[in-house]
C-alpha cells in the first residue's frame, strides 16, 4: 500500500513538472528568467500560505537555515534550468536536469563526513552519465543544442543535487512537506526579486504570460510537494526511478506541440544519462 502511494505521488510529481516545463518553455521567449522565477515561486508561496489553515503546517520553523540553503541552491538550479529550456530542446533540458542523482553521492561526500563514500558502481554510473553528455555535445559535429547551454545544464543538475540533499535533513528535523514547499518557494521568490522587472521598471510581458507562469508556479508547488513526500520518505528508489518517465513525456509533448525533433544521437545521449541516473538510484537503494 505504501509503495502504491509512492507511485501515485511520483506520477503526480512528474506530470506537474512536465507541464510546468512546457509552460516555461513557451514563456521563456516572452519573459526574462528572473521574472519567470519570481512569478512562479511567489505564486506558489502565496497559494500555499493561503491554504495554510487547511493544510495545517506550522509557519515557524526550527530549521530555517536549512530552508534558506535549500532555497538558494534550488533558485540557482531553477535559473539555469529555465535558461536551458529557452535555448535547448525541451527533452534535452529535462534530461540534463535529471542528472542530479549522479551528483548526489559526491555532494554528500563533500558536505557530510559521515556519508558513505561512493562505490565503484556509483562512480561508473557517474562516468556513464558524462559519456551521455559528451554524446549530446557531439564535439566532432553538430550537438543537440548550444554546447555552452548543455554544459550549463550539467552545472544546474549539480546545484539541484545540493538542494535535494537538504530534503532528507529537513525531514529528519521534523519539517513537514508543505513547510518545505512554502519556505522553498518563499526563499526562491525573495532571491529572484532584485533581478526582476519590478526593480528594473521595464516590464514588457503581457498579463497572459504572467498568468501562464502563475499556473506554472502552482504546478511547481504540487511537484515540490511530491519531491518532499517521495524523497523524504526514506524509500525514494521507486519515485526517483519513475520521475524519468517525464523525459519520455517531454519528448512526446515537445514533438507534438512544438515540432521539436531530437536526433538519434541526441536520443542515445539522453538514454545513457537516464540509464546512469536510474542505476545510481537503484544502487543507492539496495
Predicted regions and their residues:
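Loop-to-transmembrane-helix transition segments
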Residues: 4-13, 56-82, 147-156, 196, ...
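Transmembrane alpha-helices of multi-pass small-molecule transport proteins
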Residues: 5-6, 30-76, 103-107, 159-163, ...
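Cytoplasmic-side transmembrane-helix entry/capping segments in multi-pass membrane proteins
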Residues: 7-11, 62-73, 117-130, 149-154, ...
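Transmembrane alpha-helical segments that form core, pore/gating elements
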Residues: 22, 48, 140-200
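Structural signature of hydrophobic alpha-helical transmembrane segments
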Residues: 29-46, 82-103, 146-159, 205-220, ...
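C-terminal transmembrane-helix exit sites in multi-pass transporters
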Residues: 83, 100-124, 248-267
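Helix-helix packing/entry segments at the starts of transmembrane helices
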Residues: 93-99, 170, 174-187, 224-255
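Hydrophobic transmembrane alpha-helices of multi-pass small-molecule transport proteins
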Residues: 120-139, 265-284
Amino acid at each position: 500500500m505504501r509503495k502504491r502511494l509512492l507511485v501515485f505521488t511520483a506520477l503526480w510529481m512528474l506530470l506537474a513538472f512536465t507541464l510546468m516545463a512546457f509552460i516555461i518553455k513557451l514563456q521563456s521567449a516572452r519573459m526574462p528568467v528572473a521574472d519567470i522565477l519570481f512569478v512562479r515561486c511567489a505564486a506558489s508561496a502565496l497559494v500555499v500560505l493561503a491554504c495554510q489553515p487547511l493544510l495545517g503546517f506550522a509557519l515557524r520553523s526550527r530549521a530555517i537555515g536549512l530552508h534558506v540553503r535549500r532555497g538558494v541552491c534550488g533558485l540557482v538550479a531553477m535559473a539555469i534550468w529555465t535558461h536551458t529550456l529557452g535555448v535547448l530542446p525541451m527533452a534535452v533540458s529535462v534530461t540534463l536536469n535529471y542528472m542530479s542523482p549522479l551528483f548526489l553521492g559526491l555532494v554528500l561526500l563533500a558536505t557530510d563526513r559521515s556519508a558513505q563514500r561512493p562505490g565503484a558502481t556509483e562512480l561508473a554510473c557517474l562516468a556513464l552519465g558524462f559519456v551521455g553528455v559528451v554524446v549530446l555535445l557531439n564535439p566532432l559535429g553538430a550537438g543537440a543544442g548550444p554546447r555552452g547551454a548543455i554544459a550549463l545544464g550539467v552545472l544546474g543538475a549539480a546545484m539541484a543535487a545540493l538542494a535535494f540533499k537538504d530534503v532528507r535533513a529537513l525531514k529528519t528535523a521534523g519539517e513537514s512537506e508543505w513547510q518545505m514547499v512554502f519556505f522553498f518557494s518563499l526563499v526562491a521568490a525573495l532571491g529572484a526579486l532584485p533581478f526582476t522587472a519590478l526593480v528594473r521598471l521595464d516590464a514588457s510581458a503581457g498579463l497572459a504570460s504572467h498568468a501562464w507562469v502563475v499556473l506554472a508556479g502552482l504546478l511547481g508547488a504540487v511537484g515540490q510537494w511530491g519531491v518532499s513526500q517521495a524523497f523524504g520518505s526514506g524509500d525514494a528508489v521507486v519515485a526517483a526511478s519513475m520521475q524519468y518517465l517525464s523525459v519520455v513525456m517531454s519528448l512526446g509533448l515537445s514533438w507534438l506541440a512544438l515540432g521539436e525533433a531530437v536526433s538519434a544521437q541526441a536520443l542515445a545521449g539522453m538514454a545513457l544519462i537516464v540509464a546512469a541516473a536510474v542505476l545510481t538510484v537503484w544502487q543507492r537503494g539496495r
